[in-house]
Amino acid sequence: HVMLAHPEVQPRHVIMESEHKFVATPMETGIRFAGTAELAGLTASPNYERADILLRLGKRMFPGLSGTEKTEWMGHRPSLPDSRPVIGKCPDIPNVLFAFGHGHRGLIGAPMTGEIIADLMAKRQPKIDITPFRPERF
């Protein structure tokens, strides 16, 4: 993402731009533009080209936005080779349950994952087949 400190234009609410799929978020110290994902290895160097694109799109969204202090950031998300999360019992340690690897869809998958984990903790059969998410697939 890219963050502009103390911009002249500041939205009061989060704004999602649907055509280019990015978000403008008002922060205490400025405005943050985010919304891209890049698949790369853990040792890959950051590619801030996407941040530059986000800044251009943000300036198009807010025409009065000027070049105030800019910071760029990127971080790793827990993504797995098959793009599915790991949800289920740890095969090696009793009473340990896994629920990770949702990548950039973590917030979307959280309610269903929470229900599955609650069912497993209570020794109930989950409402959906969790075979595609089993830890042993790797």
Across the structure, where does each feature detected by a protein language model lie?
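Active-site substrate-recognition segment that forms the wall
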Residues: 1-94
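C-terminal lid/capping helical subdomain adjacent to the catalytic/cofactor pocket in oxidative enzymes
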Residues: 6, 86, 90-138
